[in-house]
Design a protein with these regions (language model features):
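Extracellular glycan-modifying ectodomains
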Residues: 1-391
Length: 391
């Protein structure tokens, strides 16, 4: 445009506003018969075009606000405890708690069958490796936490208790670590605009996990809670709900004597600053996008394999954590209790657990940390497969 500066709403910046960044779109990668038949080409093409629509985010936010106004007017008559952020949204607003929630999932026969299948896979994995101990922790979320008001919006909601009853079935060869919390505990320990827990909820989960692993008398004790007043945190629920009124602040714990850990991320040497970006936050070196994923920005994004070496540890034991992003803020806590801690994310590393354990024979404990959508995902199923099925 001959060097003329355009307003932000004429550029791709506005299209990126609600996603925390431009949607990765590569139609050429799906320009094949398989891409056409699967629909991947159409999705990629739509994303590529959508990135360039002027005023896209402004229009989305304005439209959602109009719909929300009508819903709130109706709520004056019906008195719902929570209601959709806009018509057809999977995100609900709960004004009394000043938070957003993901509407509960139905307990379909397919979902329950998948849970049973994953449980059987975990059991079979444990049987193939009697020399290791196996633990499973499924983190609650706003879809399944007990007492969530969104469960009243659908019939036959899937609850944490129902999933737990499948995994903790007696006779299994892995130990189920119960992650169930009350709704009050959930409201205190999870972000109000995002699907991730905050550091308080994560630390309570760490205490349960470490106790189950045998470290009840060696638990970390935080020195103080650090709260960052800026930047404001509008997470995945705020983006998907097209809602700007609800915000979180990033919080973290400081410890008086936390050991120095050596870090390797996907084969490259790194530092603790790569796992917790507190220096960036102290220097206000943060993303300008209002809907930036602050959880990933402050802690870290998802990687295939992270290795944490604790040279100060007296332990000769190694830990393998098989996890999704729920572990990103708290894997460092568990690493304090082991010589080496590996964090493997099946979504970004297609190695089976069998293959990993064959190459890392000093691993004594294996701990799964995931919320239900990823625990029941195909990537986890593949990670649990016997290695000889891949040959």
């Amino acid at each position: 445009m001959g060097g003329v500066a355009l307003p932000s709403w004429f550029t791709a910046d506005d299209a990126a506003y609600l996603s925390g960044g431009v949607v990765e779109a590569d139609p050429a990668a799906y320009a094949s018969l398989e891409g056409f038949s699967s629909g991947e080409f159409q999705i990629a093409a739509e994303d590529a075009v959508g990135n360039c629509i002027p005023m896209k985010a402004t229009a989305l936010l304005a439209n959602a606000a109009l719909q929300r106004s009508a819903i709130e007017t109706s709520n004056a008559l019906f008195g719902w405890e929570c209601y959709p952020a806009f018509y057809g949204s999977s995100i609900a607003e709960m004004p009394s708690r000043h938070r957003l929630l993901e509407i509960a999932e139905k307990a379909t026969s397919d979902t329950l069958a998948t849970a049973s299948h994953i449980r059987d896979g975990l059991d079979a994995l444990s049987l193939r490796h009697p020399e290791q101990r196996f633990f499973v922790y499924m983190g609650p979320d706003s879809m399944n936490v007990e007492g969530s008001p969104t469960a009243k919006l659908i019939s036959n909601p899937l609850t944490y208790g129902e999933l737990s009853s499948i995994f903790e079935d007696e006779g299994g060869h892995f130990q189920w670590i119960d992650g169930n919390v009350t709704f009050d505990e959930f409201a205190d320990g999870w972000n109000s605009t995002d699907h991730h827990w905050n550091i308080q909820g994560a630390f309570r989960a760490y205490e349960r996990m470490a106790s189950a692993l045998g470290f009840r008398d060696e638990l970390l004790v935080p020195a103080r809670l650090v709260t960052y007043d800026a930047p404001s945190f509008r997470g995945t629920f705020a983006r998907r709900g097209l809602e700007t009124r609800y915000v979180d602040q990033m919080i973290d714990y400081e410890f008086a004597d936390f050991p120095q850990l050596s870090i390797i991320i996907d084969g490259a040497e790194a530092s603790m600053d790569s796992l917790v970006h507190w220096k960036n936050y102290q220097a206000a070196n943060v993303g300008a996008n209002a809907f930036t994923s602050r959880y990933a920005e402050y802690f870290h994004t998802d990687y295939g394999l992270i290795t944490l070496e604790n040279e100060e540890s007296d332990s000769r034991q190694d830990l393998l954590i098989v996890a999704d992003s729920y572990s990103n803020c708290m894997e460092r806590f568990l690493a304090v209790h082991y010589r080496t801690t590996y964090v493997l994310d099946p979504r970004h590393d297609d190695e089976t657990i069998d293959a990993f354990l064959a190459q890392h024979q000093d691993v004594s404990d294996v701990l799964f940390i995931m919320r239900s959508p990823n625990m029941l995902a195909q990537a986890t199923e593949h990670a649990l497969e016997p290695e000889d099925m891949r040959e």
